[in-house]
């Protein structure tokens, strides 16, 4: 038999029973004839299913039923407009080591150039994280070696640590005390990859900040952005925890009506996408009208029609060729859950606009 040339790491999981030592060592495995470590009787792929972007999933269906995705150019354009660009908010002071401030004397040209650079840097900071479908659980069993049952009391993880392999395709397997050899779950993969390829800001074990009671405390202090920043650093965008924390945060913002907390942040677009997908845009729409963001309100209804083209609102707007404020009125009369409230808010806005025009 040809020697096995892949270097693997052996790691005893943290979930082992009390009193059992954790083992970590590097070994180059050389199979021997008649030994326990033999080639598997059946062939299997060394890779793992890659995460499937929503656009790829949509392409598998028929062109007629293709649903717009988060990364579509039209969708991204609308979300970027609604996010806004507030340099004061984007570059607000962060908690860090105290240093004396730096003052510069600039000419008008230098000031304009510095402002331009700040705007470009802000656009990079406002780049929206991807919105992905939840990844499919890994339940692949590779072998059932009953001869190994009872020889160990802990699980062992074998990880291919070659640098040239993308993490999503990295081969990681788990040997159970029962003798079962299986592919590692996503959670086990994330922990092992963090052990051997540490990512800044990410912990091996999930921080306690993501416990329900701690999240409620953070929300009560209006620290929703901090929660999302920590979530983005800790979890993969298609993991169950990432999606769950984001949805909880969006729901809390909607309940409190504090949409402005995420405006001019990288998470505003994801929040809007969540509300539009779940047909819960009434609160955000009212907030935009009250803040004199009528263009954003129109864009919100436009995006709603893009995602729900067969709804009464989209059909009504198409029949009436509605634009601008009329687009909002059509939505309020057809699919809005708080239609009367939206119409009243819109009426108040128009009256204030008329008074302002008359005064000027």
UniProtKB/Swiss-Prot annotation:
It is found in: Mitochondrion. GO terms for biological process: mitochondrial translation. Its main location: mitochondrion. Belongs to the mitochondrion-specific ribosomal protein mS22 family. This is Small ribosomal subunit protein mS22. Component of the mitochondrial small ribosomal subunit (mt-SSU). Mature mammalian 55S mitochondrial ribosomes consist of a small (28S) and a large (39S) subunit. The 28S small subunit contains a 12S ribosomal RNA (12S mt-rRNA) and 30 different proteins. The 39S large subunit contains a 16S rRNA (16S mt-rRNA), a copy of mitochondrial valine transfer RNA (mt-tRNA(Val)), which plays an integral structural role, and 52 different proteins. It comes from Homo sapiens. The modification N6-acetyllysine is found at residue 211. GO terms for cellular component: mitochondrial inner membrane; mitochondrial ribosome; mitochondrial small ribosomal subunit; mitochondrion.
